[in-house]
């Protein structure tokens, strides 16, 4: 093999190792949308196209100051927890789209790392949502029991007393009506009046009969 052929082979190896700068920029921009293009280009040129080193620094620059646990809302707010879960789901879908189109191995690994972190956060958020639901359910049941304690349920004695009172109320008008019919003095009905008249008539008849009998005695010879 000639020196020319050796040079040609080595130059071919060098050409295969060269990075497609434009393609790398597109991949990094899709992977780190929050970072500016100038910053991505600066880091890429800083490491002379080293994909692994570039990804590590861009990941560090793109990492928020708060940790995953700190970014999750606490304090029993189910609305915020559900909102955070929705955001994680959206980010997981976006990363999956990038994973389906990315060609660089290092970039694909970085996406997979992000997916893993998001899945862990998603599981933690689901756990917190379940705990808050249980707390809310227990709180509602305890409040219902507390409200039932303040409601007085009548027992057997009170029920019987209410029935006796109601019966007394119903009987009271009857008793009063019967008492109103009784006069202050002795009662003289129609039968007694008729009997007195009949007795008077008998006395009058006897008196007349006795008078006529006496007159006949005196008139006899």
Curated annotation (Swiss-Prot):
GO terms for molecular function: ubiquitin binding. Residues 131-194 are annotated as: Disordered. Residues 169-183 have a biased composition (Basic and acidic residues). Gene3D superfamilies: DNA helicase RuvA subunit, C-terminal domain. InterPro entries: CUE, CUEDC1, UBA-like_sf. It holds the Pfam family CUE. SMART domains: CUE (SM00546). Residues 156-166 have a biased composition (Low complexity). SUPFAM superfamilies: UBA-like (SSF46934). Residues 20-63 form the CUE domain. This is Uncharacterized protein F43C1.5.
């Amino acid at each position: 093999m000639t020196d020319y052929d050796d040079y040609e082979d080595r130059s071919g190896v060098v050409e295969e190792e060269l990075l497609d700068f434009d393609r790398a920029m597109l991949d990094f921009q899709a992977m780190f949308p929050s970072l500016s293009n100038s910053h991505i280009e600066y880091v890429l040129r800083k490491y002379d196209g080293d994909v692994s080193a570039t990804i590590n620094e861009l990941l560090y620059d793109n990492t928020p100051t708060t940790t995953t646990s700190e970014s999750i809302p606490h304090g029993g707010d189910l609305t915020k927890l559900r909102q955070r879960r929705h955001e994680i789901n959206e980010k997981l879908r976006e990363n999956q789209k990038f994973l389906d189109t990315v060609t660089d191995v290092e970039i694909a690994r970085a996406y997979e790392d992000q997916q893993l972190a998001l899945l862990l956060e998603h599981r933690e958020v689901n756990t917190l949502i379940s705990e808050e639901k249980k707390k809310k359910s227990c709180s509602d049941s305890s409040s219902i029991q507390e409200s039932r304690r303040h409601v007085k349920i009548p027992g057997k004695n009170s029920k019987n007393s209410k029935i006796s009172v109601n019966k007394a109320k119903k009987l009271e008008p009857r008793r009063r009506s019967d008492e109103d019919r009784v006069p202050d003095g002795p009662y003289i009905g129609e039968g007694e009046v008729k009997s007195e008249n009949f007795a008077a008539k008998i006395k009058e008849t006897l008196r007349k009969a006795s008078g006529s009998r006496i007159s006949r005695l005196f008139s006899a010879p």
